[in-house]
Curated annotation (Swiss-Prot):
Homodimer. It comes from Symbiobacterium thermophilum (strain DSM 24528 / JCM 14929 / IAM 14863 / T). The gene is ackA. NCBIfam families: ackA. Substrate binds at residue 90. This is Acetate kinase.
Length: 398
C-alpha cells in the first residue's frame, strides 16, 4: 500500500510518498510560493534531486505537479497515480470534534470549516490541501490526522482554564495542545527502545524546535501538555513567547499604543529566542554567539533550559513516576549542548548522563548513564510516517 502524505500551508505543500509494506520513503519534496509566478518545486525520488522555478497557480496545480513527478518515466517511483491507495493530511486543529484520525467525508469538511476560528492560519490551508488532493486524485480516499488529537485524552482538570465557565461552554476556550503526532510517534518509539509495553511506561516527551512543546505521557496517553488554546503557550520558542502573565498584554497595548493585531504579531513573530537575544530565532546561532561570550545569547540559552526544566519537574509530579525523557525536534535532536544543560540539572529525578552517548546529532539513542533511574533518549521524530500509519490503518479497516 502506497500512501501520499500532504502537509499544506497557505502557500506551500510538503509531501512524501511512502510504501507501507516496508514503511520506506519513495519520494519526498515540497512546493513553495504557491500562487506565485516564481513558485519553487522540489522533488527527490529515483535519481537526483529536482528543483524547478515557475508558475504554480494554486494547490491543485501543485498536487498535480507532484503527481507528474511521481509518475515521470525517468525520476518517478510509480507508474500511475492509481497506485496511491490514500492521501494522509496533516490538519493542525481538530477541536473537540475530532479526537482521532478520520476518513474525510463531506461532513468532515463541513466541520473543519466550522473550526477555522480555532486555527485561522492553518486549518483553511489544510482544507485547501484536502480539496486539491480530491481534485487531483479522485480515486484515493483522504484521511485527516490532527495535531490536537493525541491530547484528547487529557483530563478536564488539565485542559480547563480557570475562566468563567461560559468561555468554555460557549466558545470552547480550553487547552488543546499541539505537536500531537510527533509526541505520539516518539512515545511509541521510546517504549520500543525501553523494551516495554507502551501501556506500562510513563514518559516526558520534549519536542524542541522553532515551535516547542512538552507532554506528560502516561501509558501511551497524553495527560498534560505545555501548549494551550493556541501554540503560543508553554516553552520559549523561536519567535513565540511561551508562558506569560496575561496582564502583560493590556499593559503593553496601552503603553505602546498598539492594537490586537500588533500585539499578536509581537507575541508570535518577534518574541521567544529572537526577542530575548536580539540575534536570531535559530538555536544554532545562539550557541555560536554563546561561544563568543555574548551575554544575551547566554541568557537566552539559560532561560530556555530553565523553562523546560520547570515543565519536566511539573510533569514528573503529574506522572508520579518517570521511566523516560525524550528529546526530539530540530533542537532536541541536534543540540548536544542544550540536552546536556537540561540533563545536568535533573539529578533530583535520578538522572545520570552519558556525555559520549550525547555527542550525536539526529541519531536515535539512549544518552543517560547505565545507572540512571530515568532513561533519557534522543528520538528523531517522523510525523509523516505516523500520518501514513494512521491513514493505512483506517483504510484497511474501513
Amino acid at each position: 500500500m502506497k500512501i501520499l502524505v500532504l502537509n499544506c500551508g497557505s502557500s506551500s505543500i510538503k509531501y512524501q510518498l511512502l510504501d507501507m509494506e516496508t514503511e520506506s520513503v519513495l519520494a519526498i519534496g515540497k512546493v513553495e510560493r504557491v500562487g506565485m509566478e516564481d513558485a519553487i518545486f522540489e522533488y527527490k525520488g529515483a535519481g537526483e534531486k529536482i528543483k524547478e522555478i515557475g508558475t504554480i497557480l494554486d494547490h491543485t496545480a501543485g498536487v498535480r505537479k507532484v503527481l507528474k513527478a511521481l509518475t515521470d518515466p525517468v525520476h518517478g517511483v510509480i507508474q500511475a497515480p492509481e497506485e496511491i491507495a490514500a492521501v494522509g493530511h496533516r490538519v493542525v486543529h481538530g477541536g473537540e470534534a475530532f479526537v482521532k484520525s478520520v476518513i474525510i467525508t463531506d461532513e468532515v469538511k463541513r466541520t473543519l470549516r466550522e473550526l477555522f476560528d480555532l486555527a485561522p492560519l492553518h486549518n483553511p490551508a489544510n482544507l485547501t490541501g484536502i480539496l486539491a488532493a480530491e481534485a487531483a486524485l479522485p480515486h484515493a480516499p483522504g484521511v485527516a490526522v490532527f495535531d490536537t488529537a493525541f491530547h484528547a485524552t487529557m483530563p478536564r482538570k488539565a485542559f480547563l482554564y480557570a475562566l468563567p465557565y461560559a468561555m468554555y461552554k460557549g466558545h470552547k476556550v480550553r487547552r488543546y495542545g499541539f505537536h500531537g503526532t510527533s509526541h505520539k510517534y516518539v512515545s511509541q518509539r521510546a517504549a520500543d527502545l525501553l523494551g516495554r509495553p507502551l501501556e506500562e511506561v510513563n514518559l516526558i516527551t520534549c519536542h524542541l524546535g522553532n515551535g516547542s512543546s512538552v507532554t506528560a505521557v502516561q501509558g501511551g496517553k497524553s495527560v498534560d501538555t505545555s501548549m494551550g488554546f493556541t501554540p503560543l503557550a508553554g516553552l520559549i520558542m523561536g519567535t513565540r513567547a511561551g508562558d506569560l502573565d496575561p496582564g502583560v498584554i493590556p499593559y503593553i497595548m496601552a503603553r505602546e499604543e498598539i492594537g490586537i493585531s500588533e500585539v499578536n504579531s509581537m507575541l508570535n513573530k518577534h518574541s521567544g529566542i529572537l526577542g530575548i537575544s536580539g540575534i536570531s530565532s535559530d538555536m544554532r546561532q545562539i550557541e555560536e554567539e554563546m561561544e563568543k561570550g555574548d551575554p544575551r545569547a547566554v541568557e537566552t540559552f539559560e532561560m530556555m533550559e530553565y523553562r523546560l526544566r520547570k515543565y519536566i519537574g511539573a510533569y514528573a509530579a503529574v506522572l508520579g513516576r518517570v521511566d523516560g525523557i525524550v528529546f526530539t525536534g530540530g533542537i532536541g535532536e541536534n543540540s548536544p549542548l542544550f540536552r546536556k544543560a537540561v540533563c545536568q540539572n535533573l539529578g533530583f529525578l535520578g538522572v545520570t548522563f552519558d556525555e559520549e552517548a550525547n555527542n550525536c546529532r539526529g541519531q536515535e539513542r539512549i544518552i543517560s548513564g547505565p545507572d540512571s533511574k530515568v532513561a533519557v533518549m534522543v528520538i528523531p521524530t517522523n510525523e509523516e510516517l505516523m500520518i501514513a500509519r494512521e491513514t493505512a490503518e483506517l483504510i484497511r479497516n474501513r
